[in-house]
A protein has these predicted regions:
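N-terminal, Lys/Arg-enriched amphipathic/low-complexity engagement segments
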Residues: 1-48
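Short, well-structured beta-strand-loop connectors
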Residues: 50-63, 82
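Conserved hydrophobic positions within beta-strands
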Residues: 78-80
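Acidic low-complexity segments
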Residues: 87-145, 156, 212, 229
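Gly-rich Lys/Arg/Thr-decorated short loops/hinges at beta-loop-alpha junctions or inter-strand turns
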Residues: 108-109, 162-176, 297
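Histidine-anchored nucleotide/phosphate-binding helix
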Residues: 181-196
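Hydrophobic alpha-helical positions that pack around
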Residues: 201-312, 318-325, 333
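Ferredoxin-type iron-sulfur electron-transfer modules in oxidoreductases and energy-metabolism complexes
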Residues: 351-367, 375-377, 381-452
Length: 452
């Protein structure tokens, strides 16, 4: 098997065995959902419903706040109880629409949502993109970038290749793996629809070698389509990061500060492809997603299909509850996931996993001074100098941080993973990135005002 990869990176323990052999289970409808108006990169959405309104599943409840934004739909039928701030899994608190279920799961325009045979080959590029936009599809792998924007590259940017990300390189997570096995046809049709929308000549489905069953099944499914290939990849982190995946699959280098479309590529996730099939073939918006609930801190690890807005507590209860020694719950994997302060936070479009860790796996490490060992530099997939960037950020040296490429950091956590001094490199670099980007925005605003 010809296994490709990128240079550098790390090899953390996989911990996939908890759930990689477990079929997706459907979570019972929640009694209530809390649907954030900010679930994506870009402008937050604007609520178009009011307290006390009756709502049906699939109904638009918040409109896009700009081109780089995404529609939000009701994920259950019932009544709007509140539109106010609630705990958010990424931002601590956020504006949400709380809906109390009527237990009916009654869809809006039910007749239009019944699956039907649709001759999608006759659809235009614009028709597919409109369906995607109307469905509120964002990148389901975690980035949550509005898909209709990705499918609309600027003039002069042509896309020749679609790469479907089936790596799922974060430890513990297996949702994408299970979807490739259980929803294979929808994955492949989604790839073909995205290719048509982009005008892409070919597609490559990148899958890490620790998923041989998925490689085999997807390879069989694409046999009739010579312009779609499967590329097995070495098991390494962060193989699923866009720039690393493009390098491994195509040997193309995305320029510093650039985007995949700069090298004529678009990267999408397995779950995103399925969402496109749902949107185009079934007129079904994004109301649910597969979430891996796993770790030694959960009694019955599972892959769960849950409605957006469902509190984490519901999923954890469905999986038998936390163990007595559970100490931390993350949204996402252990490398890039976010620790949660409450289980009242809801599943959002970017929730790929809920990882429950026990006290034995959480070590309170003492930080020591940097010993200049260079370990962080040797593993950084972006060829940065993490220890220097962290030091610049700590000392508020923003110009130097920008000069040494702090905004190019993808925050994968590889540097912190190998640091023998236990320095919180990613946290410091993240703060530095925020500050540098803030300074950049202010400078652009000033320049715009002065030019007028």
């Amino acid at each position: 098997m010809n296994l490709r990869t990128f240079k550098k990176g790390v090899r953390p323990s996989e911990f996939k065995e908890f759930t990689d052999g477990k079929s997706i289970e459907i979570l019972p409808l929640p009694d209530e959902v809390f649907i954030p108006v900010q679930q994506h990169i870009g402008a937050p959405c604007k609520p178009v419903v009011e307290k006390g309104m009756d709502i049906k599943t699939g109904q638009i409840i918040a409109t896009a706040g700009g081109f780089v934004s995404s529609l939000i739909h009701a994920t259950i039928s019932g009544k709007v109880k509140a539109i106010e701030s609630f705990p958010h899994p990424l931002s601590g608190q956020g504006l949400m629409i709380q809906i109390i279920s009527d237990g009916k799961d009654e869809w809006i325009n039910t007749g239009e949502n019944v699956p039907k045979v649709r001759e999608w080959e006759k659809l235009s590029k614009d028709e597919i993109i409109t369906d995607v936009q109307n469905a509120g599809i964002v990148g389901m792998g975690g980035a949550a970038f509005p898909l209709h924007v990705k499918l609309s590259p600027p003039k002069g940017k042509t896309i020749d290749t679609l790469i479907l990300n089936g790596c799922e390189c974060e430890p513990f997570l297996t949702a994408d793996h299970r979807m490739m096995l259980e929803k294979t046809d929808d994955v492949i049709l989604g790839v073909r629809l995205i290719m048509k929308a982009l005008g892409a000549e070919k597609a490559i489905i990148g899958i890490e070698a620790n998923k041989p069953d998925a490689i085999e099944k997807i390879t069989k499914a694409i046999a009739p389509f010579p312009n779609i290939t499967v590329q097995p990849l070495k098991v390494k982190y962060p193989q699923g990061a866009e720039k690393m995946l493009i390098k491994a699959a195509l040997n193309r280098n995305v320029p510093a500060g650039g985007l995949p479309m700069d090298v004529n590529v678009v990267v999408n996730n397995v779950g995103t492809a399925i969402a496109v099939t749902d949107a185009v073939m079934r007129k079904r918006p994004v109301i649910e997603r597969v979430v891996t609930v796993t770790g030694k801190g959960i009694r019955e690890p599972k892959n769960v299909l849950a409605r957006i807005g469902t509190p984490f507590q519901n999923l954890i209860d469905f999986c038998g509850g936390l163990t007595e020694d559970a100490a931390k719950v993350l949204m996402g994997g252990p490398m890039m996931g976010v620790a949660q302060h409450t289980l009242a936070v809801p599943v959002i479009k970017a929730t790929s996993g809920i990882v429950c860790l026990t006290s034995e796996s959480i070590v309170d490490k003492k930080e020591y001074p940097c010993i200049q060992c260079g370990a962080c530099i040797r593993v950084c997939p972006m060829d940065l100098m993490p220890t220097r960037l962290a030091r610049f950020a700590q000392n508020c040296k923003w110009d130097e941080a920008e000069k040494f490429g702090i905004v190019n950091c993808i925050e994968c956590g590889s540097c912190a993973f190998v640091c023998p001094s236990n320095i919180p490199l990613v946290q410091r670099i993240r703060i530095g990135k925020l500050k540098v980007n803030e300074i950049r925005r202010k400078q652009k605003t000033v320049e715009k005002v002065e030019s007028n």
